[in-house]
């Protein structure tokens, strides 16, 4: 309840409507899954699981269940500083992400966030995806301060760590197996991110 109230305060502060839902279920994952389906929820935001021991997965059991059983946007976050102190948002975008149905939605999220915070949104993507990003931003998000850099090889994701400072938000766009922009290198993401 405390976290729900805190989330409501945060969304109100940035003019994002939030409808609070209370549900009792067998476990947290099934409660979220059933609520998402019943209420046609399109986006779920959850914190990054705290790895308690060596056998725990990087994303944890909850995120694993949500990824397997839901087909909606899942934002797994770990903020080390207050959001309002961010100076830049660095977004790594995989090839062919522009062909995914969620492309405009996450673009909207990060452009709105950059605009609200008054910080730059720096996209790293290949040439084709960058062209789609630029077109969408010119159409719908002209006011957002943006930068674009080439990220030719998704395996070079660790190169981005040199671009990220303590007051930056690193966003890595990923896709589920079987989708157009899915790449087998996504399986390495948890290991790369934990470094």
Positions of the model-derived regions?
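Well-ordered alpha-helical segments embedded in enzymatic catalytic cores
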Residues: 6, 31, 105-109
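Intrinsically disordered or low-complexity boundary/linker segments at protein termini
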Residues: 1, 15, 37, 42-128, ...
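Inter-domain helical "communication" segments and dimerization helices
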Residues: 6-14, 140
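Short, well-ordered alpha-helical microsegments
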Residues: 29, 130, 157-158
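Charged docking surfaces used in two-component/phosphorelay signaling
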Residues: 23-30
